[in-house]
Amino acid sequence: MSSSCIEEVSVPDDNWYRIANELLSRAGIAINGSAPADIRVKNPDFFKRVLQEGSLGLGESYMDGWWECDRLDMFFSKVLRAGLENQLPHHFKDTLRIAGARLFNLQSKKRAWIVGKEHYDLGNDLFSRMLDPFMQYSCAYWKDADNLESAQQAKLKMICEKLQLKPGMRVLDIGCGWGGLAHYMASNYDVSVVGVTISAEQQKMAQERCEGLDVTILLQDYRDLNDQFDRIVSVGMFEHVGPKNYDTYFAVVDRNLKPEGIFLLHTIGSKKTDLNVDPWINKYIFPNGCLPSVRQIAQSSEPHFVMEDWHNFGADYDTTLMAWYERFLAAWPEIADNYSERFKRMFTYYLNACAGAFRARDIQLWQVVFSRGVENGLRVAR
């Protein structure tokens, strides 16, 4: 049964409801209220399901049409800003994860290729419509931009300026996605690029996009790389590495970077070190992911590099995600035959929940520039 067929129901006056109502009221959210961030319950078992199953129950019950919210992004932002997780009754703290407080906080899995097949191979029909022409599935830079395309191009330009690219350089792009950055670097800075991805769909599109340029796209694990590059860049890939592999990751970068080279890391980050796994994101979105913390990045990079610059523009990811959501909704009539209504609700939940988390400053977006100690230092672009 679709969610549109399920009418709002009278909420049961039991302990499940009372606990949920008390918690949500602390965030200024009403049950069956009329404000944009209020939730409308369509199944009386909703409260029990969420309190018993936590984040997974919250997300799956939305996918099943058990509850609605006009502005999911506002709902998550309010819940996270209120710090509800820290206000839970003691005996619920291990199981209750209302609002998915760490939506990207996922542990790494041994089989790194899973994420390529589960998420990035969903289909280019979806991503090509939702993303900008450069197919950037990472945070845009909105400082002087007023639309997604210009904001993503501003991000690409800033990356290249931070890397201080010069004609003839060899550049390694770890986690190259659909080849947008590789294409931009090769066509605008006359550099040779090697891109690495674990998604067959991404490799195919990246090769087509970069045809005629000095760009090679490899379908392989980054740990197998053994070459020499003037510059290395990694955008939106470190989230899939996992804490147990952070030391290996920086060792691989060190092994492949020339002595005078520069490395730029672009990653979502956690405001504190936490290895907990969010079961909903782990099951439906990124089966191989975990957000790094400042401490983890510093510890793993310290044996190899000098940290030249740390740039946080996480607030821009909120704007980016809402732009993606707007384009996703606009494109849905064109792609609906390829996906289920439940998939639409899943992706709606994912984009809005993440936007709310960035808006609440619960998660961050960092660009970190490393060298081995460039003489006279680096003047890093903004």
From Swiss-Prot:
Main location: cytoplasm
Family: Belongs to the CFA/CMAS family.
Molecular-function annotations in GO: bicarbonate binding; cyclopropane-fatty-acyl-phospholipid synthase activity; protein homodimerization activity
Entry keywords, A to Z: Cytoplasm, Lipid biosynthesis, Lipid metabolism, Methyltransferase, S-adenosyl-L-methionine, Transferase
Role of this protein: Transfers a methylene group from S-adenosyl-L-methionine to the cis double bond of an unsaturated fatty acid chain resulting in the replacement of the double bond with a methylene bridge.
Entry remark concerning the domains of this protein: Each of the subunit of the dimer contains a smaller N-domain that associates tightly with a larger catalytic C-domain.
Oligomer and partners: Homodimer. Homodimerization is required for catalysis. One subunit probably binds to the lipid bilayer and positions the other subunit for catalysis.
Effect on the protein of changing residue 308 to Q: Loss of dimerization and catalytic activity
GO annotation terms (biological process): fatty acid biosynthetic process; lipid biosynthetic process; lipid modification; methylation
EC number of the protein: 2.1.1.79
Catalytic residues of the enzyme: 354
Binding annotation for S-adenosyl-L-methionine: 137-138, 171-179, 197-202
Name the record gives this protein: Cyclopropane-fatty-acyl-phospholipid synthase
Catalytic activity annotation: a 1-acyl-2-(9Z)-enoyl-sn-glycero-3-phospholipid + S-adenosyl-L-methionine = a 1-acyl-2-(9-cyclopronane)-acyl-sn-glycero-3-phospholipid + S-adenosyl-L-homocysteine + H(+)
Pathway the protein contributes to: Lipid metabolism; fatty acid biosynthesis
Gene Ontology cellular-component terms listed: cytosol; extrinsic component of cytoplasmic side of plasma membrane
Signal peptide bounds: none
Activity regulation details: Inhibited by sinefungin, A9145C and S-adenosyl-L-homocysteine.
